[in-house]
């Protein structure tokens, strides 16, 4: 009997095993939709970015005005730009929910998948930071100056590294050109890393909400989860389009409507909202190098999860105290986001420092509490 083309064609077979005949746990909830939503976000960002790049000019004298030109003169340029800017926000909403799901349900026990996921998160954060610099508004310029300056905290190599990154003695034309170059290439590297992320995931199969082996009860990915994913796509696109058409500048910074001026510093230099929690952690350490280390660790600490797991059950569904701790940690991150947007003055400094300690303590104490709970029930 002839096999369907999707089972015999060498290229279609790969797609088929990943998207059609893939055995998926029957009980995965909507929390498992965010992987496909991130794929959709990445495609939206690459497509809108590609068309924006056709009209953008990476030159400090022209960048701000080329963005203005895109919004005023290019057909649907305003739509492309607002979709791209707000698409980044949705990308981060989905990525944080995706990571939170992985932490809650113990998906980090797929060690290679998890570690590649954290690397993807770093790459996406780097891409978003460089994209924020491109319109060359006040916050673009000063954000680039402040964040790249952090490299100078590295002992011995610091200043050389910063000047090498800038391509001169200050953030200038060379910096903008290279940031545009990297901003263009990185999403394609993220795309390649996503393929590897999926490759490792499909070696083990998906986790599920009860954290047990689901090999005895699996269903094909298509049509069940393809349609479930499409429902997620519709919901997300609806919210994104609503934001873009009703209040496109809601999540942006008003300072970025002012062309970059190296002689005037904005009153409050702050990144986009999705970096504020990390920015608050950076600011809460009085020492420059210590702040940089804390900033990197705020994300890199996710990498310890697979190696510091002491529980008998996968995830924290069956650990009530850990559930309370998890949601408290989420509140901590939200409060850090609020602190990141506040000026550096009391009581905000102290609150930020307390929240930073609480944030890092979660990762260290959480496995110990699961161990204690297991011993209690023995």
From Swiss-Prot:
Heme b b562 binds at residues 84, 183. InterPro entries: Cyt_b/b6_C, Cyt_b/b6_C_sf, Cyt_b/b6_N, Cytb/b6-like_sf, Cytochrome_b, Cytochrome_b_C_euk/bac, Cytochrome_b_N_euk/bac, Di-haem_cyt_TM. SUPFAM superfamilies: a domain/subunit of cytochrome bc1 complex (Ubiquinol-cytochrome c reductase), Transmembrane di-heme cytochromes. One of its GO terms (molecular function) is metal ion binding. The keyword Transcription regulation does not apply. Keywords: Electron transport, Heme, Iron, Membrane, Metal-binding, Mitochondrion, Mitochondrion inner membrane, Respiratory chain, Transmembrane, Transmembrane helix, Transport, Ubiquinone. PROSITE patterns: CYTB_CTER, CYTB_NTER. Heme b b566 binds at residues 98, 197. Binds 2 heme b groups non-covalently. It holds the Pfam family Cytochrome_B. Its cofactor is heme b. GO terms for biological process: mitochondrial electron transport, ubiquinol to cytochrome c. A ubiquinone binds at residue 202. CDD domains: cytochrome_b_C (cd00290), Cytochrome_b_N (cd00284). It is a multi-pass membrane protein. GO terms for cellular component: mitochondrial inner membrane; respiratory chain complex III. Component of the ubiquinol-cytochrome c reductase complex (complex III or cytochrome b-c1 complex) that is part of the mitochondrial respiratory chain. The b-c1 complex mediates electron transfer from ubiquinol to cytochrome c. Contributes to the generation of a proton gradient across the mitochondrial membrane that is then used for ATP synthesis. The main subunits of complex b-c1 are: cytochrome b, cytochrome c1 and the Rieske protein. PANTHER family: CYTOCHROME B. Heme 1 (or BL or b562) is low-potential and absorbs at about 562 nm, and heme 2 (or BH or b566) is high-potential and absorbs at about 566 nm. This is Cytochrome b. It comes from Drosophila mauritiana (Fruit fly).
């Amino acid at each position: 009997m002839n096999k369907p083309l999707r089972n015999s064609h060498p290229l279609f077979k790969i797609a088929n095993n990943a998207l059609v005949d893939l055995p998926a746990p029957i009980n995965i909830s909507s929390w498992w939709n965010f992987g496909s939503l991130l794929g959709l976000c990445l495609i939206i960002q690459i497509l809108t970015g590609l068309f924006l790049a056709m009209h953008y000019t990476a030159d400090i004298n022209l960048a701000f005005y080329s963005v203005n030109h895109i919004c005023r003169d290019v057909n649907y340029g305003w739509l492309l730009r607002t979709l791209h800017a707000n698409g980044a926000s949705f990308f981060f909403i989905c990525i944080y929910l995706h990571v939170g799901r992985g932490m809650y349900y113990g998906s980090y026990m797929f060690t290679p998948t998890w570690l590649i996921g954290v690397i993807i998160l770093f790459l996406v954060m780097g891409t978003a930071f460089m994209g924020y610099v491109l319109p060359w508004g006040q916050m673009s310029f000063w954000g680039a100056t402040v964040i790249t300056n952090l490299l100078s905290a590295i002992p011995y190599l610091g200043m050389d590294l910063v000047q090498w990154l800038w391509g001169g003695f200050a953030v200038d034309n060379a910096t903008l050109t290279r940031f545009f170059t990297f901003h263009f290439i990185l999403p394609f590297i993220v795309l390649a890393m996503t393929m590897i992320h999926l490759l490792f995931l499909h070696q083990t199969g998906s986790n599920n909400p009860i954290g047990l082996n689901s090999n005895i009860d699996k269903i094909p990915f298509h049509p069940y989860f393809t349609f479930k994913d499409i429902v997620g796509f519709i919901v997300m696109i609806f919210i994104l389009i609503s934001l873009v058409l009703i209040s496109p500048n809601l999540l942006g910074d008003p300072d970025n409507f002012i062309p970059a001026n190296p002689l005037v510093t904005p009153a409050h230099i702050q990144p986009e909202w999705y970096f504020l929690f990390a920015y608050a952690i950076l600011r809460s350490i009085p020492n420059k190098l210590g702040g940089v280390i804390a900033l990197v660790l705020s994300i890199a600490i996710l990498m310890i999860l697979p190696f510091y797991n002491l529980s008998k059950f996968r995830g924290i569904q069956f650990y009530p105290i850990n559930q309370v701790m998890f949601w408290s940690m989420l509140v901590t991150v939200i409060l850090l986001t609020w602190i990141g947007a506040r000026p550096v003055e009391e009581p905000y400094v102290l609150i930020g420092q307390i929240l930073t300690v609480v944030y890092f303590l979660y990762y260290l104490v959480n496995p110990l509490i699961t161990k204690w709970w297991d011993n209690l029930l023995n």
